């Protein structure tokens, strides 16, 4: 049976499950549950009460009580069978809950718990955790994708997942076998762009980490052992508002307790900020946003109100945070680290100014690798076998021509949704026909709303707006994760949260053949009128408004900067500034080099930056007011480093490698010639290697124009490189030589070095680095200016 969302119109309700279960199975479940109730410290009622007490609004609306009952019974059955000796606190918060993050819930636990328990029966808790991660690797491997998170069953169906989906699968699998597990995030890296998620597992009274679907031979080992040492924040959201496990609490909500786990990984410090007014007085009640520079924005990772002493604090890595403090219409921006920091509210909303910030991340100090060479070799052989197992699994996709669904949607969309989207459908307009609105779970809504809305007197945008304003109860506090509630569920319950109410507005419009969307740039709710103009809608106002827009024209002069064409999210970003803080303009469709940008009237902050090879950032902040019908010209400033590339290590250009198709080894120098060259040692799979290939592809034009050889050793291919020399590194001689020359004591690929024929290394990167292209391009540009080549 294919698992689907639990809904009267969707396949796989609890009633259907019970009908398809054998009589023997039903008797077994009932008898096991009865036995558990008599011997366990927590029973079915206590479990259900615990889940419902902190259940997000969407989960309570979409999934019936029978769904939760079936999963609770299975969880209690596993607890009795496996007898791991898990204390009630860890079991209730880290085994019982189905929800890991913001994924679509499915039937994973009831489908796979027995399989997983059989696989690890008789093992120790540590062995079982490692083995389940191997099972996860048999099901899925890494591939980047969009921000919507697949449920674990859909990830298995796909065979692929980004780190957030791999970790959801791994946590779900561990919990299904009765082992406490949680998903841990660095919300943003400080030394490079992007973020990462992995798994912590509770073994012998302590939390240990694993790379999800990236099994190793021991716990506390993953490819991110080095990058995690440069993190500024590591956190997880624990199901339940009253969790008390000893970790630092970042925030408590009605649904979860957000905790900071950085102290379990690396040295940390208390970053303390004191908010002051212009006269030096401490300001109470100011909003203090702790931010990390990433993807060219100051990404907010935590937010507090200053106390009576004007202070707010957060445990962080030993590096710079960017602080935006604000109260009423005043604000201030500064970099902070350690305990003695102040931010002055010396700016006013609407005030135009510019400032420079230099942001320094923590230094690298890789976590210890406790595995032996023999363990590594055995694990590598297992990974190859697991790759073949995964490749043998079918990975079906649906066909949905004309519905404007993404590749990911075609993995988990149900037949019912596809059929419903065609109900009384004659349009080809994507803003009418597509069942995908935002990141909500896809559940049929068109037939339901097209039939019931007119009965409720709803036929126009004005009537939709009035109905949603007057008849839908908002319960934002019950959905602090911001989970997107499917429109059919909000309609039936007459209850929603603010963002999901927006989704219901779009669904109602589309069901009545009115083009509608949530603007992908600024998140505003819109419909398209008969003149083809997009009109903004405020559901708390009775009057739709035509958008008043102006143009921001960014004037970029390259000068000595190595970047020829700054890119959005890489070199600059634009955020709206208001009393509510900042809101990023998501200009995903902005064409490279197009610096004339239409924006709604408002006050904006332009953040630009150059990330240097050591991970630090030279950032620039510029604010601007955009007025209707006016083109406002603002310089786009990139602060490049004035220093020439430095020699940072040494290597032997006479070291041999085996060129592709050759029978005898040859020296690097004989393949590259005199001058500079690039060496890339990488595998074809694994998240760090996938990112390296994508980064090299992104700057292939610059590398081709540079004209120097790129020696690629290992299984990675970069077809766009015109000067690539492919080969292998027998016995790892080249890799070991580079690591010795850089005095690097850690293992891990990719290894990328920019060298010259004198044996000097001027750029080096090892492991995960999503800023590789930007850094490498900058060094090459500097070399060209210095040497003319």
Language-model segment annotations:
Residues 118-134, 143-153, 158-251, 323, ...:
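Hydrophobic/aromatic-rich core segments of domains that either
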């Amino acid at each position: 049976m294919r698992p689907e969302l639990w809904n009267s119109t969707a396949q796989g309700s609890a009633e259907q499950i019970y009908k398809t279960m054998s009589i023997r199975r039903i008797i077994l479940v009932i008898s096991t549950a009865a036995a558990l109730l008599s011997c366990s410290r927590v029973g079915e009622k206590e479990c259900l009460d615990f889940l419902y007490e902190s259940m997000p609004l969407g989960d309570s609306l979409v999934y019936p009580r029978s769904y939760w009952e079936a999963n609770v019974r299975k969880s209690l059955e596993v607890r009795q069978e496996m007898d791991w000796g898990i204390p009630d606190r860890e079991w209730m918060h880290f085994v019982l809950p189905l929800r890991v993050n913001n994924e679509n819930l499915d039937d994973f636990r009831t489908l796979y718990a027995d399989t997983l328990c059989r696989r690890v029966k008789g093992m120790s808790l540590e062995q079982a955790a490692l083995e389940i991660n191997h099972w996860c690797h048999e099901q899925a491997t890494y591939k980047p994708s969009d921000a919507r998170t697949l449920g674990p069953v859909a990830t298995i169906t796909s065979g692929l997942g980004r780190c957030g989906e791999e970790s959801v699968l791994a946590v779900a699998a561990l919990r299904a076998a009765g082992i406490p597990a949680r998903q841990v995030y660095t919300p943003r890296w400080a030394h490079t762009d992007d973020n990462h998620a992995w798994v912590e597992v509770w073994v012998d009274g302590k939390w240990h980490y694993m790379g999800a679907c990236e099994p190793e031979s021991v716990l506390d080992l993953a490819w991110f052992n080095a990058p995690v040492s440069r993190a500024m924040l590591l956190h997880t959201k624990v199901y339940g508002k009253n969790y008390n496990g000893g970790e630092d609490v970042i925030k408590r909500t009605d649904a979860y307790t957000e905790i900071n786990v950085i102290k379990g990984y690396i040295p940390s410090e208390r970053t303390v900020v004191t908010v002051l007014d212009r006269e030096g007085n401490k300001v109470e009640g100011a909003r203090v946003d702790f931010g990390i520079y990433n993807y060219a924005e100051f990404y907010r990772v935590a937010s507090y109100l200053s106390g009576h002493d004007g202070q707010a604090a957060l445990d962080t890595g030993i590096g710079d945070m960017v602080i935006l403090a604000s109260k009423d219409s005043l604000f201030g921006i500064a970099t902070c680290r350690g305990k003695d920091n102040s931010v002055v509210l010396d700016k006013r909303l609407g005030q135009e100014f510019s400032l420079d910030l230099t942001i320094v991340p923590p230094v690298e100090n890789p976590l210890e690798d406790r595995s032996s060479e023999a363990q590594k070799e055995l694990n590598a052989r297992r990974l190859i076998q697991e790759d073949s197992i995964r490749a043998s699994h079918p990975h079906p996709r649906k066909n949905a021509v004309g519905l404007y669904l993404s590749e990911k949607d075609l993995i988990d969309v149900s037949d019912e949704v596809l059929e419903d989207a065609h109900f009384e459908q004659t349009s080809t307009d994507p803003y009418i026909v597509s069942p995908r609105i935002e990141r909500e779970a896809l559940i049929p809504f068109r037939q339901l709303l097209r039939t019931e809305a007119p009965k409720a007197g709803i036929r126009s945008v004005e009537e939709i707006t009035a109905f949603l304003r007057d008849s839908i109860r908002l319960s934002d506090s019950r959905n602090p994760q911001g989970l997107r509630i499917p429109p059919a569920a909000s309609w039936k319950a007459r209850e929603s949260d603010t963002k999901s109410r927006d989704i219901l507005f779009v669904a109602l419009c589309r069901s009545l053949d009115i083009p509608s969307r949530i603007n992908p740039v600024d998140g505003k709710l819109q419909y398209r009128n008969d003149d083809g103009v997009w009109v903004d809608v405020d559901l708390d106002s009775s009057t739709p408004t035509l958008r008043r827009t102006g143009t921001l024209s960014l004037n970029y002069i390259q000068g000595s900067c190595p970047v020829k064409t700054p890119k959005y999210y890489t070199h600059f970003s634009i955020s709206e500034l208001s009393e509510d803080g900042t809101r990023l303009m998501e200009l995903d469709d902005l064409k490279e080099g197009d610096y004339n940008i239409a924006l709604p009237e408002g006050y904006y902050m332009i953040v630009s930056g150059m990330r240097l090879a050591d991970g630090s950032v030279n950032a620039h902040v510029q604010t601007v007011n955009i007025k209707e019908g006016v083109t406002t010209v603002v310089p786009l400033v990139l602060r490049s480093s004035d220093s020439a590339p430095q020699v940072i290590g040494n290597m032997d250009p006479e070291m041999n490698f085996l060129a592709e198709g050759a029978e005898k080894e040859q020296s690097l120098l004989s393949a590259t010639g005199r001058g500079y060259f690039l060496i890339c040692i990488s595998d074809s799979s694994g998240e760090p290697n996938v990112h390296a290939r994508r980064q090299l592809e992104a700057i292939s034009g610059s590398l081709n124009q540079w004209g120097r050889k790129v020696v690629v050793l290992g299984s990675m291919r970069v077809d766009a490189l015109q000067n690539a020399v492919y080969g292998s590194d027998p016995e790892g001689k080249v890799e070991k030589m580079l690591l010795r020359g850089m005095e690097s004591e850690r293992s891990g690929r990719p290894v990328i070095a920019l060298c010259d024929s004198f044996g000097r290394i001027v750029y080096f990167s090892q492991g995960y680095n999503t800023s590789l292209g930007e850094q490498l391009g900058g060094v090459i540009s500097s070399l060209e200016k210095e040497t003319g080549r």
